[in-house]
Amino acid sequence: MTHTAALAPVLAEHIAAVNAFDEDAIAATFADDALVNDAHREFWGTEAIRRWAARELVGDRVTVAVTEVLDHYGDTIVRGCYDGDYDKTNLPDELILTNYFTVRDGKIVSLFVIRNTPASY
């Protein structure tokens, strides 16, 4: 079942760390063997995730303004308005990305970042 939810503490810490451009704090929110999938690319483990965060979040000074939080059978779906110094060619003025988080034992074990488009039916 899907319903509106509050951010779990680790997810609030994660968003705050992204907005603070703090790669150490970002990496600390993930389990050692976590998976991030961003733009159809996989990053496994905290060291790979740290490199991804350093280059693509901190390096591009990405910020996230959360617009919606949903619980879906224990996973958390977070939609947010993204901004930063990244290449915005062919992107909408307001970039909304959907983050699909799985949290276990107080750590993020998976994060999938998706730019969804509305279904035509």
Where are these regions (language model features)?
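A short gly/proline-enriched turn/hairpin at secondary-structure junctions
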Residues: D33-W44
